[in-house]
Regions:
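Short, structural beta-strand-to-alpha-helix junction motif
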Residues: 71-73
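Hydrophobic alpha-helical membrane-insertion segments, chiefly the h-region
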Residues: 31-41
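N-terminal Sec-pathway targeting helices
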Residues: 14-32
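Concave beta-strand-loop units of leucine-rich repeat
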Residues: 63, 77-141, 147-167, 173-185, ...
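Short amphipathic alpha-helical segments that mediate assembly, nucleic-acid/protein binding
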Residues: 2-6, 54-55, 135-138, 235
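N-terminal Lys/Arg-rich, disordered targeting/topogenic segments
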Residues: 1-20
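Surface-exposed cap/linker segments adjacent to membranes
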Residues: 42-68
């Protein structure tokens, strides 16, 4: 094979290589356009809610003039905070999973302004059977909120008691926790929530400081009206474990800080 033939073959191979590169580039661009198109269509689909009252609550969170029929996936994915109020309003909590990027969630009035409940008729009582269903749903839904940093629950009106919060052990990003007016006695899940800095357990059934002391980064602790707050030995051990934390024992007693400075 002479030199000219060799050069022709090399030139031909280069042309083929360039053609292959163009085909590959075109395929990549086409794929990206298709992926973007599919993503756009998905995000702009209308959401189908399972519970009409949750649909209303989520729509109201998105904006004051938003109707459930107009809510799209891009809208629910943008929600960072959700306060669903009394659980008695709902048949199911499944729609919470639509808000997959939640950072803060309040359940059964955790964070509600309860003075808006003017009479007992405003309180929606949940049966024990329904409360068990809600507990199972929360156990499935809450750990899936991978960005969740604040969880709040209150049974202030004694209308729906969630007695098992072990599902929170999977919420490793939690920084703020509120479990108030609850009959739960098991707080062992706290050992897995290493990032918590602020915890409020007022009117809960916590009886000793052991589980709290497993949290090394606590800055604020509220144990109003708990068995723990009435045990001076346990309170002293808690103060020793967190010498720089604000520890709220009762409305007129705060440990580790000068109340006058507040």
């Amino acid at each position: 094979m002479n030199e000219e033939n060799v050069m022709n073959i090399l030139h031909s191979n280069r042309e083929k290589l360039e053609k292959y590169k163009k085909v590959i580039r075109l395929a990549i661009v086409t794929t990206m356009i298709c992926v973007c198109g599919i993503y756009y269509l998905y995000m702009n689909r209308h959401v189908k809610f399972q519970d009409k009252n949750m649909a209303y609550e989520i729509s109201r969170t998105i904006g004051p003039n938003v109707n459930p029929e107009n809510v799209k996936y891009k809208d629910v994915y943008a929600i960072k905070e959700l306060n669903i109020g009394q659980l008695g309003k709902y048949d199911t909590l499944e729609d919470i999973k639509l808000c997959k990027n939640l950072v803060r969630i309040s359940v059964n009035g955790g964070g509600d302004k309860w003075n808006s409940l003017e009479t007992n008729d405003d309180v929606l009582i949940v049966t024990n059977k329904k409360a068990e269903t809600f507990q199972k749903e929360l156990a499935d839904l809450i750990p899936e909120l991978k960005r969740l940093k604040r969880f709040a629950y209150s049974n202030y009106c004694r209308n729906c008691d969630i007695s098992d919060f072990s599902f929170l052990s999977e919420c490793r990003q939690l920084e703020i926790l509120r479990i108030c007016y609850s009959d739960t006695t098991d707080f062992s899940f706290l050992k897995s929530c290493k990032k918590i800095v602020d915890i409020d357990l007022q009117e809960s059934q916590i009886k000793d400081a052991d589980d709290l002391k497993s949290l090394k980064n606590l800055e604020t602790i509220c144990i109003y009206d708990t068995r723990l707050s009435k045990d001076e030995t346990e309170v002293e051990s808690l103060c020793k474990a967190f010498p720089n934390a604000k520890i709220f024992i009762s409305e007129d007693k705060v440990q580790n800080i000068d109340i006058k400075e507040e």
